[in-house]
Amino acid sequence: MSELTALTIAEARDKLKAKAITATELTDAYLSAIDAANDAINAYVAVTHDQARSMAKASDERIAKGEAGALEGIPLGVKDLFATKGVHTQACSHILDGFKPEYESTVTANLWADGAVMLGKLNMDEVAMGSSNETSYYGPVKNPWRAKGSNADLVPGGSSGGSAAAVAAHLCAGATATDTGGSIRQPAAFTGTVGIKPTYGRVSRWGTVAFASSLDQAGPIARDVRDAAILMKSMASLDLKDTTSVDLPVPDYEAALGRSVKGMKIGIPREYRVDGMPGEIEELWQKGIQYLKDAGAEIVDISLPHTKYALPAYYIVAPAEASSNLARYDGVRYGLRVPGKDIADMYEQTRAAGFGKEVKRRIMIGTYVLSAGYYDAYYLRAQKVRTLIKKDFEDVFAKGVDAILTPATPSAAFGLADEVLANDPVKMYLNDIFTVTVNMAGLPGIAVPAGLNGQGLPLGLQLIGRPFEEETLFQAAHVIEQAAGRFTPAKWW
């Protein structure tokens, strides 16, 4: 069975088309793998055995009739942030206890319309707030990777830790994820997988639990660049239900793979050489530069002067939007309700019991920066900084730069229940140092594995592109992947 779960989406698609395997066989192989591994890894918070089998059966029937969709019979995991009709959707928060939506998110509806099979809902940081998948109400996810000679558990990154871990451990062929400040790219880098955060507006946000609406964007996590391109094609669409959705044709991203990068101008931002960056990250970056240079790309030094303000500005804008978005969870119409002596007391008791520590922290920060006395000093100033960050990128792209290469994370995956990080949220927030600028500017960014560190843990590089030019990112990421190879964890679970 494990040989079936080892297939990439592209390989499985070809075998299904050739009728060498059936969607039912493939789905059963994944369900068996999940049942055997989930107690150890905790990637899934709900496994939809019956639904998966009936979807696979329907796929086999369509394949037999010659009516196969682009993802026909491909078993996928869905981050618990996406509404799935009649299926557990709780954003891994106690506040949404028992919530089963009566509607389907646009992203998942697009995937099912193309024939994909749902295996279940994936663990994540509560309401997508976190960088280690330790804030989930359902407990932490364990990274399928371990350091050489060690049995210590590592985090898979966050907030899409369940998506990244499930893809790396072959518990799904690919997964949906979301990215507000790095929640696709950082876990992808920590698990040796590929994750792309599309341009803001490329993929519909409708039916996805909102964290920070001006920053949130859905995208795929997959085993390789080709699989990410295949998934992205199905996920992206114009959606009139999302006012930020952009009416642009969705290209065939897979067709961009293998195109030459000769003459492509790749920018290297000097501001990303941060103090205290480990030598192994600098080394990886240089390797990535060399891979692209060897393939014919032109490497240029660039400056993004407002980079150093991105993280503090992000941690004002994102909590501000979150405090507004999360006001709707009050125990009245759905989810958890804790009785109180009157309605105000019920709200208070429900929200106190329903939200975890990190979510409460961010709601309080957000409410504080939006309050009358501090709005101008914090929120307004952060929005002005955001405009300057966006302009930095526009200036660089105006000079002919096609893509920007940076590290994806400042380190490899760190230990589960790390006391230093648990006691210092700012240190945890620094995990997003290379990724938040992309969300602040609404640009596309992809994380691609580029090597292993001295302890045998995966490290990723990030490519940042012009708005709606995801094809360029797939093209350049494919070059790095071809040079660096692919990375799979040794099985311990």
From Swiss-Prot:
The keyword Transport does not apply. GO terms for molecular function: ATP binding; glutaminyl-tRNA synthase (glutamine-hydrolyzing) activity. It catalyses: L-glutamyl-tRNA(Gln) + L-glutamine + ATP + H2O = L-glutaminyl-tRNA(Gln) + L-glutamate + ADP + phosphate + H(+). Belongs to the amidase family. GatA subfamily. Keywords: ATP-binding, Ligase, Nucleotide-binding, Protein biosynthesis. It is an enzyme of class 6 (ligase). The keyword Protein biosynthesis applies. This is Glutamyl-tRNA(Gln) amidotransferase subunit A. Heterotrimer of A, B and C subunits. GO terms for cellular component: glutamyl-tRNA(Gln) amidotransferase complex. The active site is at K79, S159, S183. Allows the formation of correctly charged Gln-tRNA(Gln) through the transamidation of misacylated Glu-tRNA(Gln) in organisms which lack glutaminyl-tRNA synthetase. The reaction takes place in the presence of glutamine and ATP through an activated gamma-phospho-Glu-tRNA(Gln). GO terms for biological process: translation.
